[in-house]
Structure formats: structure tokens, C-alpha cells
Regions:
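Catalytic machinery of carbohydrate-active enzymes
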Residues: 1-227
Length: 227
């Protein structure tokens, strides 16, 4: 069974969509999967079982990235096309069946609307597939003999960020004397281009307790470290 799975550009929305992808994999062990998504989300799909290809949809002028997707997929016959972006060009692919988001129910959570695409009665919980390298790296980076507090102090938009002094105060309360994670190490996560923002906070973390992972590991390794 050949599946084209068109999902989000945003990382968070793409992760939510992994729930129905996992359900399809469990229901169809012989599934052969092609995934189309934005560049930020692409790394989380690298180890999906039965993956044939990840098509990265870099945004182009006049929405030409959709035409590019059509050109890459038109020569295949798809047993199932799932399009969570509702791109009109996916209607023009050779396929047996196509499922899309349709009109979202504003009274429901996004994850509920995604689960309804394949007619699930319950919400499909997100699923990430890490590799052996990611699992091993997490064991090396995250100590098992002390508590660890994970902090993600950055964002892609400054208005979304919390001030570094607030994070510093939170760390002091949580890991200080009588805190719920007393003397914990602090693992700091973020993208490489967000490093200057993260450094402001990391400089305030006591020596020997900061685990600096900002821009140093892949998304799948971030997942295994947090697990």
C-alpha cells in the first residue's frame, strides 16, 4: 500500500499529525510512505518505519512549491493520499483514495480534527520514531544519577519568549534548597540561531550544572533527551 502523507510546515502541527500516521502504520504493516512537509518538521520523520522519501516543501513565490510537489508525485499511483494542508493539486494525483482536513470544527482541538481525518473515535496520540544513535546519545548527554530540569528558553518570535531573569528565578526555585528538583542539572535546548538568547540564561546557571544542548543535537535527539 502506497501512502502520500502531506503534513504541516510548523513543527508543532507536524508532531500532532504523527498520531494518525502511526495509526496507519499499525493498521497497514506493508505501508510504503512518502511524507511531504516543511523544512522545520522534516527531521522528525527521518526514522518513520517503511519510509521511502521525505519531500521538503520549501516555500516558493506564487505557491510554486505545491506545483513542485505535484511534479514529484504525479508519476506514482497512490493507494491513499492524506493531505492535511488541503492543497488543490493533490486532487490531481493518480490515487485510489484521498482524505483531507475539510472544514475544521472550531469547537474542537486541532488534534481532534486531525484524528477525524481517518475517522478515529479517539484522539491519536503523537508518535516519534528515534534512531539508535539518538537513543545512545541521550544516554551519554543526560545523567541518570541526578535529577535534570529541561529548559527551552527561546522561540522564533521575541514576543513569545519569557525574559531570561524569569527563567533564572524559576531554576533557582525548582533546583535550589527545598526545591522539587534540588541540585538538579539544567539541560538547555534551542536552535543554533537562538544561541545568543540562550547564552544570557546559561551564564547564570551554576558551573557544572548546565547541560548546553542549544544547536548541538538533532530534533530526534532532543526527543530522546527529553524522554
Amino acid at each position: 500500500m502506497k501512502l502520500l502523507f502531506v503534513t504541516s510546515t510548523r513543527l508543532g502541527d507536524a508532531i500532532i499529525s504523527t498520531g494518525i500516521l502511526n495509526q496507519l502504520i499499525e493498521d497497514n504493516p506493508n505501508l510504503r510512505i512518502t511524507i511531504a512537509c516543511g523544512p522545520a518538521a522534516a527531521p522528525i520523520f527521518e526514522k518513520v518505519p517503511n519510509l521511502e522519501r521525505v519531500i521538503v516543501l520549501d516555500k516558493m513565490l506564487f505557491s510554486l512549491h505545491w506545483l513542485r510537489l505535484w511534479g514529484l508525485c504525479i508519476y506514482s499511483f497512490w493507494d491513499l493520499v492524506i493531505d492535511l494542508r488541503n492543497a488543490p493539486l493533490t486532487f490531481l494525483l493518480f490515487r485510489k483514495k484521498r482524505l483531507g482536513m475539510g472544514k475544521s470544527d472550531k469547537s474542537r482541538l486541532f488534534i481532534e480534527n486531525v484524528s477525524k481525518v481517518i475517522n478515529l473515535d479517539q484522539v491519536a496520540s503523537p508518535k516519534i520514531w528515534p534512531g539508535e544513535v539518538d537513543l545512545k546519545l541521550a544516554e551519554e548527554l543526560i545523567p541518570s544519577n541526578v535529577p535534570v530540569l529541561a529548559i527551552g528558553p527561546t522561540a522564533n518570535w521575541k514576543a513569545k519568549t519569557w525574559r531570561s531573569e524569569y527563567f533564572s528565578e524559576l531554576i533557582s526555585r525548582v533546583t535550589g534548597s527545598n526545591g522539587i528538583l534540588e541540585n538538579a542539572h539544567i539541560a538547555v535546548f534551542g536552535r543554533s540561531d537562538e544561541r545568543p538568547m540562550a547564552l544570557v540564561l546559561m551564564e547564570k546557571i551554576p558551573d557544572g550544572r548546565c547541560i548546553d544542548l542549544v544547536g548541538k543535537i538533532s530534533l530526534l535527539s532532543v526527543y530522546t533527551c527529553l524522554s
